[in-house]
Design a protein with these regions (language model features):
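Short beta-alpha junction loops
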Residues: 63, 95-96, 122-128
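Conserved N-terminal substructure of TIR/SEFIR domains
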Residues: 2-88, 113-116
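C-terminal interaction surface of TIR/SEFIR-family domains
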Residues: 1-28, 37-41, 45, 56, ...
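Short amphipathic alpha-helical segments
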Residues: 42-44, 66, 102-105, 133
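Conserved TIR/SEFIR loop-to-helix hotspot centered on a Trp-containing motif
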Residues: 95-113
Length: 183
């Protein structure tokens, strides 16, 4: 957070500038357990749908499209490159993935080395279960409709080219039901 210098006097204490930074090019890295590939795909599709395709994402398990690791590519190098390019990392925290070392590693690299925003999304597990260990330092998101809507809106606000479509709440509700069913 940056200090707002316009009120730096003895009469007025400094204010914190808490605005969400707008990024010129947004890439959301969707960190997930490979067994949750369908959930990661549903979340990536949600981001694309509500932003009319302007909010791009990467998920290593993508086998259908072009947002995964290409055949023949060195997977570790590809993942590290995408983490470096990411403006945000959304870690999908499910019963299968909470304690998986790879999700912890990706979140650690993103936050510790690259200073990238890490957002934990608890899917099918209580927030208090995911808000321990390394994810205890983050304000994590639950899978209820209001929280999921707020998370998606936060990601959209960081992208100057994205404007949420009117179907945002409908898309989130449908995706939330699918995510709850699959997790």
């Amino acid at each position: 957070m940056k200090l707002n210098k316009r009120h730096m006097s003895k009469k007025h204490p400094p204010e914190l500038d808490t605005k969400i930074p707008v990024r010129p090019k947004t890439l959301v890295f969707v960190s997930h357990d490979s067994r949750d590939a369908d959930i990661a795909e549903a979340f990536a599709n949600l981001l694309s749908d509500v932003s009319a395709g302007t909010l791009k994402s990467f998920r290593s398990s993508d086998k259908k499209g072009n947002s995964g690791i290409e055949f023949g590519a060195e997977w570790y190098t590809s993942i590290m490159s995408q983490l470096e390019d990411a403006t945000d990392v959304v870690a999908l925290l499910t019963a299968r993935s909470i304690d998986r070392p790879w999700i912890l590693y990706e979140a650690g690299v993103a936050k510790g080395k690259l200073e990238t925003t890490v957002l934990g999304l608890a899917l099918g597990v209580p927030l208090d279960k995911v808000s321990t260990g390394p994810f205890g330092q983050f304000q994590n998101c639950g899978d209820d409709e209001d929280s999921l809507t707020r998370l998606v809106m936060q990601l959209l606000q960081r992208n100057p080219d994205a404007s949420p479509r009117e179907t945002l709440n409908k898309s989130i509700f449908a995706t939330r039901r699918r995510l709850a069913f699959e997790s």
